[in-house]
């Protein structure tokens, strides 16, 4: 596996691979890779001849009071994960490589980004759409792999690919969880031991919602209320949002009549965690 830092070096490989008729899978990440990322890379390596993993903490998707400066980084560890999972290239650019100082062009999305995490993190999805578009242009992948834990991100990227006519298949991969149910996340490393135990309230509350749905509950108010009450049992937890939306459009629903996404964002101490599940009729 090669570790590359420049766009021009990546493009040299892409040009040769395309010349040879090889398929390319892209796994965009912000590094500090865990088993969730590993599962994306492994799937990409099974479905493509070559796999590029981008390892880039994208500054323009962070807000002014967010964790850009302290976001965990460990390139050596990431390289080991990528090598074992079958990646061909680990692309680790500096921000100055990805963005011109005087750049005036960005990729934005509307409506679908005005809810859930997008409503709480202004500008976040402009940063996501811009960096993903740039990565698509740099790597020319046949397929790109994203985790379902970031459900809104997956929906936004799928819509962007459709709207901008990218000839790329977006592959959404299942959430990978710890043994106690906590969704794998790089931000889990911020949690103290006490907070780590408390964080299981996210998956517990979602499991309760699944039980209600499995037992025939159709009223979204009742589902959300049950989640809120369950999370309220954990003293270290503070709800950011609890939402039930159409799984494709992400529009709010009041009654379960179609495939839905149940999504939550919860602060455990000062650490904001997200989780979700999709329930199909």
From Swiss-Prot:
Residues binding (R)-pantoate, per UniProt: 61, 153
Q: Where is the active site?
A: 37
Coiled-coil portions: none
> Taxonomically, which superkingdom?
Bacteria
Q: Which GO terms describe its molecular function?
A: ATP binding; pantoate-beta-alanine ligase activity
Q: What is its EC number?
A: 6.3.2.1
**GO BP terms, alphabetized:** pantothenate biosynthetic process
Q: Which GO terms describe its cellular component?
A: cytosol
Matching Gene3D superfamilies: HUPs, Pantoate-beta-alanine ligase, C-terminal domain
Stored NCBIfam families: cyt_tran_rel, panC
* HAMAP family per record: PanC
Query: What is the name listed in the Swiss-Prot or TrEMBL entry for this protein?
Result: Pantothenate synthetase
| Species per Swiss-Prot/TrEMBL record | Clostridium acetobutylicum (strain ATCC 824 / DSM 792 / JCM 1419 / IAM 19013 / LMG 5710 / NBRC 13948 / NRRL B-527 / VKM B-1787 / 2291 / W)
Taxonomic placement: Bacteria, Bacillati, Bacillota, Clostridia, Eubacteriales
């Amino acid at each position: 596996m090669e570790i590359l830092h420049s766009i021009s070096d990546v493009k040299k490989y892409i040009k040769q691979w395309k010349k040879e008729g090889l398929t390319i899978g892209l796994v965009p990440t912000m590094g500090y890779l865990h088993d969730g990322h590993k599962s994306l890379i492994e799937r990409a390596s099974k479905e493509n001849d070559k796999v590029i993993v981008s390892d880039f903490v994208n500054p323009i998707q962070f807000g002014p009071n967010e964790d850009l400066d302290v976001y965990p980084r460990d390139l050596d560890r990431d390289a080991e994960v990528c090598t074992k999972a079958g990646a061909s290239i680990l692309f680790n650019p500096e921000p100055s490589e990805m963005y011109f100082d005087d750049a005036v062009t960005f990729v934005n999305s509307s409506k679908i980004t005005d809810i859930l995490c997008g409503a709480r993190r202004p500008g976040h999805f402009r940063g996501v759409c811009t960096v993903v578009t740039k990565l698509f242009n740099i790597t020319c992948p046949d397929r790109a792999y994203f985790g379902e834990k970031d459900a809104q991100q997956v929906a936004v990227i799928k819509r962007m690919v459709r709207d901008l006519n990218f000839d790329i298949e977006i592959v959404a991969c299942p959430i990978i969880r710890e043994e106690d149910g906590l969704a794998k996340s790089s931000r889990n490393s911020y949690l103290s031991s006490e907070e780590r135990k408390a964080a299981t309230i996210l998956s517990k509350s979602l499991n309760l919602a699944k039980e209600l749905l499995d037992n025939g509950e159709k009223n979204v108010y009742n589902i959300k209320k049950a989640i809120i009450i369950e999370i309220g049992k954990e003293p270290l937890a503070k709800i950011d949002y609890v939402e039930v939306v159409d799984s494709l459009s992400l529009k709010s629903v009041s009654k379960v009549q179609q495939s839905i996404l149940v999504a939550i964002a919860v602060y455990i101490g000062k650490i904001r965690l997200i989780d979700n599940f999709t329930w199909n009729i």
